[in-house]
């Protein structure tokens, strides 16, 4: 498995398994399937309501905890120093672990400065190996990064072929912060899976549209966490390290970029419910 080195030296798999919209009832089975396929990075969140399923799978899978990379996120309602601090301990209890590998602020709302301070303390206490943010557009990201003690290791944002986050990624690089993609398949929107450019490129390599889309992001040094509840799709999504897109391929896919969200008209100023956003 290829990894990326975060700004504190921690190695993180560049490909992981996301459990957004995976029900609590099926989460344990899905994570066990993903680990059996070869995934070692699992992305969950307080707002997904399935941290316990992830924890059960990690306990039962037979893979040593230190070989797994677990990410969770502090939700808006747990924002602020005191609430965030308590919620981090609750997440660890549900995950049945003394630590998470990556701890993120889920949204730039509520008192996210206080939230981040609680996360910095968790990091120093060994409860998180790395910390970062999610859904922080450049202005909010810079505002936090300039005034925090520990620079965010990751910013998880909507990133796919139709919203490639090119300029935001350039800004993140200045802080040595990695971009992590949620929604790498755009949840099928904009006729993603029938896109002619992706199909034509995939035919050259004997790969699917999904595999081409993941490979494109990986070659841009973007962490990806595709989600599927079907094991055969987990296998397909995992099989992206035996080919390399050419410069021409990358340029053609770059031409698909619309530079706007397919999900929200203004993510910064609209606070969605936890069921509506990864």
Tell me what each language-model feature is.
Residues 1-68, 185-186, 271:
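N-terminal binding-site loop/beta-alpha segment at the start of enzyme catalytic domains
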Residues 22-25, 45-53, 77-82, 108-113, ...:
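Acidic-and-aromatic substrate-binding clefts and catalytic sites of carbohydrate-active enzymes
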Residues 23-33, 80-94:
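Short, acidic/polar
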Residues 57-64, 92-96, 145-148, 173-174:
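Acidic (Asp/Glu)-rich catalytic clusters
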Residues 66-78, 101-108, 135:
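A short, structured active-site edge motif that brings together acidic residues
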Residues 84-104, 121-125, 177:
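CE4/NodB-like, metal-dependent polysaccharide N-deacetylase domain
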Residues 107-265:
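Beta/alpha (TIM)-barrel catalytic core signal, keyed to glycine-rich beta->alpha loops juxtaposed to Asp/Glu
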Residues 269-278:
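Single conserved hydrophobic/aromatic residue that forms the stacking wall/gate
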């Amino acid at each position: 498995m290829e990894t990326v080195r975060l700004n504190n030296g921690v190695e993180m798999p560049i490909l992981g398994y996301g459990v957004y919209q995976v029900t609590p009832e099926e989460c344990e089975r899905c994570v066990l399937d993903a680990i059996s396929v070869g995934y070692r990075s699992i992305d969950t969140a307080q707002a997904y309501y399935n941290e316990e399923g992830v924890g059960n799978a990690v306990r039962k899978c037979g893979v040593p905890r230190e070989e797994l990379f677990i990410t969770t996120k502090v939700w808006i309602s747990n924002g602020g120093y005191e609430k965030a601090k308590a919620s981090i301990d609750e997440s660890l209890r549900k995950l049945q672990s003394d630590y998470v590998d990556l701890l993120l602020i889920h949204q730039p709302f509520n008192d996210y400065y206080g939230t981040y301070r609680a996360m910095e303390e968790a990091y120093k206490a060994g409860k998180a190996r790395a910390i970062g943010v999610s859904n922080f557009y450049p202005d909010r990201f810079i505002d936090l990064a300039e005034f925090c003690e520990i620079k965010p290791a990751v910013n998880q944002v909507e990133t796919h072929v139709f919203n490639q986050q090119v300029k935001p990624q350039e800004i993140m690089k200045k802080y040595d912060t990695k971009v992590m993609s949620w929604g790498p398949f755009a949840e099928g929107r904009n006729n993603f899976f029938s896109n002619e450019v992706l199909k034509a490129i995939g035919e050259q390599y004997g790969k699917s549209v999904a595999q081409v889309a993941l490979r494109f992001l990986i070659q841009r040094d973007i962490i990806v966490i595709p989600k599927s509840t079907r094991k055969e799709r987990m296998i397909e999504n995992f099989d992206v390290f035996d080919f390399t897109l050419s410069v021409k391929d990358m340029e053609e896919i770059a031409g698909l970029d619309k530079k706007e969200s397919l999900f929200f008209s203004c993510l910064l100023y609209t606070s969605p419910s936890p069921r509506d956003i990864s």
